[in-house]
């Protein structure tokens, strides 16, 4: 099994998979008579059909035991999906490029600093939300509409990956 190297989450490194949602280094302008700084258009919600709706949900995630064997990734072919941490905790991100199936050797792992969210572009393979904390809440922006919007791919045993965040503690 290949051990995933956990990279810091940056806009440049994550660009092939989607958007990093953060205020650091982002364009902004003042609104509300100068009392509010608006960080505008940090990501775009992607939908496939004219009748699709962008919806907002909250996911409450439970931590999985680590190290974690990554045996499955999912994708949303009908729309993007964004995760914004609500409690300020770092979280893990596992992604693979758009394609008919995720390629184990192209799969990458990132860690958010807790002030960064991610917006997976339509069709990007990713692991379901991975909190480091025992329990964590995320604001989720994704698509509601007709048709299947979640494909799952299970890796063959020879393609399994290992995610171990413990080096972050040292």
From Swiss-Prot:
This is Ureidoglycolate lyase. Pfam families: Ureidogly_lyase (PF04115). One of its GO terms (biological process) is purine nucleobase catabolic process. Belongs to the ureidoglycolate lyase family. Pathway: Nitrogen metabolism; (S)-allantoin degradation. Gene3D superfamilies: Ureidoglycolate hydrolase (2.60.120.480). Its EC number is 4.3.2.3. InterPro entries: RmlC_Cupin_sf (IPR011051), UAH_cupin (IPR047233), Ureidogly_lyase (IPR007247), Ureidogly_lyase_bac (IPR023525), Ureidoglycolate_lyase_dom_sf (IPR024060). It catalyses: (S)-ureidoglycolate = urea + glyoxylate. Catalyzes the catabolism of the allantoin degradation intermediate (S)-ureidoglycolate, generating urea and glyoxylate. Involved in the utilization of allantoin as nitrogen source. Keywords: Lyase, Purine metabolism.
């Amino acid at each position: 099994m290949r051990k995933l190297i956990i990279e810091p989450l940056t806009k440049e490194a994550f660009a092939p998979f989607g958007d990093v949602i953060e205020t650091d280094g982002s364009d902004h302008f003042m609104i509300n008579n100068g009392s509010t700084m608006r960080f505008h258009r940090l990501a775009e919600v992607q939908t496939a059909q004219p009748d699709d709706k962008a919806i907002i949900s909250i996911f409450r995630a439970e931590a999985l035991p680590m190290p974690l064997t990554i045996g499955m990734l999912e994708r949303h072919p009908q729309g993007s999906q964004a995760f914004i941490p609500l409690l300020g905790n770092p979280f893990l991100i596992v992604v693979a490029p758009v394609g008919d199936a995720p390629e184990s050797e192209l799969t990458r792992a990132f860690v958010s600093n807790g002030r960064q969210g991610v917006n997976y572009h339509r069709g990007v393979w990713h692991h379901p939300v991975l909190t480091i904390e025992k329990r964590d809440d995320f604001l989720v922006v994704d698509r509601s509409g007709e048709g299947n919007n979640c494909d799952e791919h299970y890796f063959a045993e020879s393609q399994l990956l290992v995610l171990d965040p413990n080096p972050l503690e040292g």
